[in-house]
């Protein structure tokens, strides 16, 4: 029996990697437009980071984390999300001592033990942005505008932005009391997980995926009716900023997000009933992880779900030729010259492929076509004697005679 990749994982083969590279370059450029710099964090962290940050009562911590003990008996978890590690790095690196705000972006694999289905894998990849140190709602609007810009640049239409405010610990306490009073009428119908959440963190019940619980919370009190004056003012400011930026949105009072660290603003981008990007404000997470009291806001965007969306909307990602010139050869002497010529061209960043398998010229040209080479050139005894060779443009068959010793003229063909 041949070995296979674990369930819920997927290999990224060379025939697909160009799509990822295209998107990653797009994201990097857009992140740079907003003054964000890249951060890279370990693929695993101490489990306590996610217990404290994400929350003990969340589905992520209770059901979905890949957790194990290392050889020293320490509890380690493969990271299930990108924000907590970024915050941990921000605190550990004492970046809070620098002039704020601090703006970061990242690409990271995240691992969750979930039911494998369309657009949902056990290892998927996130593009994320985190901004630390700014509390005004204008930065929330700026963060939201980044995915808006990404979808616009990629030509993705039909994406809906939903926003909500889940308040702060002060006003959430009042809401939790009202929510518990409402839920108590149907306590016996709650799933076992939500029964444990009832006293510890009733807000999490709104995020339950079990059908009976989803039905119960349909008529639950709306958190926007309970937020304090400060949180209400922040939410009104956010809406005003989004209006100024001409960003359309809907208010969804039942968005709470599946992670405990969120406060005030939460948002989701949805298309075809699938959430393809989500985020919000987390003004208390930095302090929870051991740093000073400092506001923050960010989002995570699933790469696999974005690629699925592009595919379903028939949006093609352009594939650039990854070989400028295929250098064919006829005979051992020509092969030596081809090796030397390829080195000189590569030293000047011309992407070259050569034959290492002793193929016939016909087979070499067939291979050049398969790899999408822009040009081809074959060296044989005649070309070595005259110092002249013909470069063929693979797209239309156009031919150009060149002096193979005149490197400057040769390179101009590819520029």
Curated annotation (Swiss-Prot):
Record flagged with keyword Aminoacyl-tRNA synthetase:
yes
Q: Which reaction does it catalyse?
A: tRNA(His) + L-histidine + ATP = L-histidyl-tRNA(His) + AMP + diphosphate + H(+)
Q: Which GO terms describe its cellular component?
A: cytoplasm
> Where is this gene product found?
Cytoplasm
Q: Which UniProt keywords apply?
A: Aminoacyl-tRNA synthetase, ATP-binding, Cytoplasm, Ligase, Nucleotide-binding, Protein biosynthesis
Q: Which GO terms describe its molecular function?
A: ATP binding; catalytic activity, acting on a protein; histidine-tRNA ligase activity; transferase activity
A GO biological process held by the record: histidyl-tRNA aminoacylation
Q: What is its EC number?
A: 6.1.1.21
List where the protein spans the membrane: none
Q: Which Pfam families is this protein grouped with? A: HGTP_anticodon, tRNA-synt_His
The record's note on quaternary structure and interaction partners says: Homodimer.
Q: What is this protein called?
A: Histidine--tRNA ligase
Coiled-coil annotated spans:
none
Could you say which protein family the record assigns here?
Answer: Belongs to the class-II aminoacyl-tRNA synthetase family.
> Is Hydrolase set as a keyword in this record?
no
CDD domains tied to this protein: HisRS-like_core, HisRS_anticodon
């Amino acid at each position: 029996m041949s070995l296979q990749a674990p369930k819920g994982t997927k290999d990224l083969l060379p025939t697909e990697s160009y799509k990822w590279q295209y998107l990653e370059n797009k994201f990097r450029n857009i992140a740079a437009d907003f003054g964000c710099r890249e951060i890279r964090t370990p693929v695993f962290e101490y489990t306590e980071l996610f217990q404290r940050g994400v929350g003990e009562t969340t589905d992520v911590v209770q059901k979905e984390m890949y957790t194990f003990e290392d050889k020293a008996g320490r509890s380690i978890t493969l990271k299930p999300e990108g924000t907590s590690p970024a915050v941990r790095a921000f605190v550990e690196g004492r970046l809070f001592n620098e002039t704020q705000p601090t703006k970061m972006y990242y690409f990271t694999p995240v691992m969750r033990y979930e039911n494998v289905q369309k657009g949902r894998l056990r290892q998927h990849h996130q593009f994320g942005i985190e901004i630390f140190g700014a509390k005004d709602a204008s930065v929330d609007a700026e963060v939201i505008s980044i995915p808006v810009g990404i979808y616009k640049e990629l030509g993705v239409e039909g994406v809906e932005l939903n926003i909500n405010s889940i308040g702060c610990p002060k006003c959430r306490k009042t809401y939790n009391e009202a929510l518990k009073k409402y839920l108590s009428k149907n306590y016996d119908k709650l799933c076992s997980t939500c029964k444990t959440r009832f006293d510890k963190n009733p807000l999490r019940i709104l995020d339950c995926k079990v059908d009976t619980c989803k039905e119960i919370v349909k008529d639950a009190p709306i958190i926007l009716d309970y937020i304090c004056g400060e949180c209400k003012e922040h939410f009104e400011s956010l809406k005003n900023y989004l209006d100024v930026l001409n960003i359309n949105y809907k208010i969804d009072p039942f968005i709470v997000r599946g992670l405990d660290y969120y406060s005030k603003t939460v948002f989701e981008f949805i298309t075809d009933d699938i959430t393809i990007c989500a985020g919000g404000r987390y003004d208390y997470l930095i302090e929870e992880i051991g740093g000073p009291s400092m506001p923050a806001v960010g989002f995570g965007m699933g790469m696999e779900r974005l690629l699925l969306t592009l595919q379903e909307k028939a949006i093609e990602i352009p594939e650039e030729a990854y070989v400028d010139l295929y250098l064919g050869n006829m005979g051992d002497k020509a092969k030596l010259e081809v090796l030397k010529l390829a080195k000189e061209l590569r030293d000047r960043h011309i992407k070259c492929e050569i034959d290492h398998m002793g193929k016939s010229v016909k087979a070499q040209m067939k291979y050049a076509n398969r790899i999408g080479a822009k040009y081809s050139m074959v060296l044989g005894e005649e070309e070595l004697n005259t110092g002249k060779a013909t470069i063929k443009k693979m797209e239309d068959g156009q031919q150009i005679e060149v002096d193979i010793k005149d490197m400057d003229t040769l390179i101009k063909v590819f520029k």
